[in-house]
From Swiss-Prot:
Its EC number is 7.1.1.8. SUPFAM superfamilies: Cytochrome c, Cytochrome c1 subunit of cytochrome bc1 complex (Ubiquinol-cytochrome c reductase), transmembrane anchor. Heme c binds at C82, C85, H86. This is Cytochrome b-c1 complex catalytic subunit, mitochondrial. The keyword Mitochondrion applies. Its main location: mitochondrion. The gene is CYT1. Disulfide bonds: none annotated. It comes from Candida albicans (strain SC5314 / ATCC MYA-2876). Disruption phenotype: Leads to lethality, showing that it is an essential gene. GO terms for molecular function: electron transfer activity; heme binding; metal ion binding; ubiquinol-cytochrome-c reductase activity. It is found in: Mitochondrion inner membrane. Gene3D superfamilies: Cytochrome c-like domain, Cytochrome c1, transmembrane anchor, C-terminal. Coiled coil: none annotated. It is a multi-pass membrane protein.
């Protein structure tokens, strides 16, 4: 009997020892994984770019629309600065009508450019002035020409750039205004690169492009670096979502109509069911 009790006690001690060892091992592994994750998080800002601050854009409100004067100024910045390297393939001249320009203004800008036309009777290619239906042309014929002109870097199309980047307009504004005079100490950049903390990795082929008074706004707005960055960010946000204003207008209309129908349904329900729910029955037992 004593032998059996001693054997049982030894088995219990072994089980407790194994359980304690497993617990210590698990805690140690968890601590090491936590330290490794902290190291990875510390590298995130350098590897993935500094997170841009959240700016109070006027069009971010639930019932707010774009600042169309800012869209017009932003298109001017794009046309005079950004269009030298970046395309806007998804935007046609007609998209500007009623948003930032009149029909005659958009048509005049389109006619300044030449587009490929149908060949003549002899099969030779012809050129024609642009029309409102034409899309805004890019600066390069193809990707190879773009890379050759930019030391191997390929300038992205800006039609959907706001939707394609985490942070949207905040990222675009921060990137355009985030170039320091000198890179931080210890940062080594590849040849032909520039330092920008908001760009993943910090090394970006595009140098600073916005400087005070670089463009002359038609409405007399001071063309500071931050103002130009704000306007072109607003324009690119509109370019990535041209239906933004109409969507909010239709959403407001739908909200009003559905709310009215909901209130009407409550009234109908009460009108139809109140007599039924308040109906009382009287039971008269049969007389014997």
């Amino acid at each position: 009997m004593f032998r059996t009790a001693y054997k049982t006690m030894n088995q219990s001690m072994v089980q407790k020892f194994i359980a304690g060892g497993v617990g210590v091992t698990g805690l140690t592994a968890s601590y090491l994984l936590y330290q490794d994750s902290m190291t990875a998080d510390a590298m995130t800002a350098a590897e993935h770019g500094l997170h841009p601050p959240a700016y109070n854009w006027p069009h971010n409100g639930m019932f707010e629309t774009f600042d169309h004067a800012s869209i017009r100024r932003g298109f001017q910045v794009y046309r005079e600065v950004c269009a030298a390297c970046h395309s806007l393939d998804r935007i046609a001249w007609r998209n500007l009508v009623g948003v930032s320009h009149t029909t005659s203004e958009a048509k005049a800008m389109a006619e300044e450019l030449e587009y490929d036309d149908e060949p003549d009777d002899e099969g030779k290619p012809r050129k024609r002035p642009g029309k409102l239906a034409d899309y805004i042309p890019g600066p390069y014929e193809n990707e190879q020409a773009a890379r050759a002109a930019n030391q191997g870097a390929y300038p992205p199309d800006l039609s959907l750039i706001v939707k394609a980047r985490h942070g949207g307009s905040d990222y675009i504004f921060s990137l355009l205004t985030g170039y320091p005079d000198e890179p931080p100490a210890g940062v080594v950049l590849p040849e032909g690169s520039n330092y920008n903390p908001y760009f993943p990795g910090g090394a970006i082929a595009m140098g600073r492009v916005l400087f005070d008074d670089l463009v002359e706004y038609e409405d007399g707005t001071p063309a500071t670096t931050s103002q130009m960055a704000k306007d072109v960010s607003t324009f690119l946000n509109w370019a990535s979502e041209p239906e933004h204003d109409d969507r909010k207008k239709w959403g407001l209309k739908a909200l009003v109509v559905l709310s009215s129908l909901y209130l009407l349904s409550i009234w109908v329900k009460r009108f139809k069911w109140t007599p039924i729910k308040n109906r009382k029955f009287r039971f008269d037992p049969p007389k014997k």
